Amino acid sequence: MRNTRQITKAMKMISAARLRRAQERALSGRPYAQMLTNVLKSLVSRAEIFDPETGAPRHPLLAQRPEKNILVIVVTADRGLAGAFNANIVKAAARFLAANEGKNIDIEAAGRKGRDFLRRRFPTATPEQVERAGAVQIVGEHIGVLGKLQFEYVRDFSESVIDRYTKGEIDSVYVLYNEFKSVIAQRLVVEKVLPIEEIGEKTIAQAEELTKEEREMRAEAAKSAGVSLGEADTAEMDRRAAAFATAQVDYIYEQPPAELFRDLLPKYVAVQIYRSMLESTAAEHAARMTAMDSATSNADEMIDKLTLAMNRARQAKITKEIIEIVSGAAAQ
């Protein structure tokens, strides 16, 4: 039991260190995402995004169709020992699928745990089936990429998603992930990425906050691991990012609006998917740190109980031997 306690305590400290790095990556990407959003909002407010004659959007990612074929990106972890982190995500995925029963749903599974769960329930599409959705099926797996996530990988992945949307194979794209705010402020989110209904406004289809008990457990785990409970102090950076490209002036763009849309909208989609994966990774480490802290506390309690039981048994044995010695001496 003491060996188990040492293992869980070490895993808690490792998760705390990884949480700090994951949190830094998630926070450092927010100003860029905010600035990109502001540029697009400024461009949309000054350019015609729909053809005045046909009413068609000037970019395919702005097109909206009846939602018959859905792509959902389910972001879980590659490893377990994170409490209910993975279970909560796959349960939310099951609820999302049930709410959209009757529609064709393709699943991109990011993370081994979610992939394993979904594989047991739904078939994996063959290469010739990927181009056409059918009921619920797994069309992609992304295993071992979240721990060392690179934007280049997400960009390539988002290009394949955009290509399917542009061809009309899918009508909407959702990302299901854990949104990280701080160690004790997270929520499970189903976010609509495509179609882009309004630049800069996240369309949350479903959200679940941590319970009070979960927040208290995470707060205790963070304190013992030396991790800050609040959000990192990025107020000045966030303020500058929020003010970027928002001045009420007429910007002069070198490229025509159509070319800017062609360059920026795909990047906007890639950034949204990348951000969701970074947030989920930070949330995963926070959940694992909490789970290992709880396991360490349980091990401490078990060690105390076993030590007490062992001492009582030893004391009873010694007492019995003394009584036997005294009784033998008295009989002589």
Q: Each predicted region: which residue ranges?
A:
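C-terminal beta-strand-loop-alpha-helix "lid" module of Rossmann-like NAD(P)-dependent dehydrogenases
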Residues: 1-332
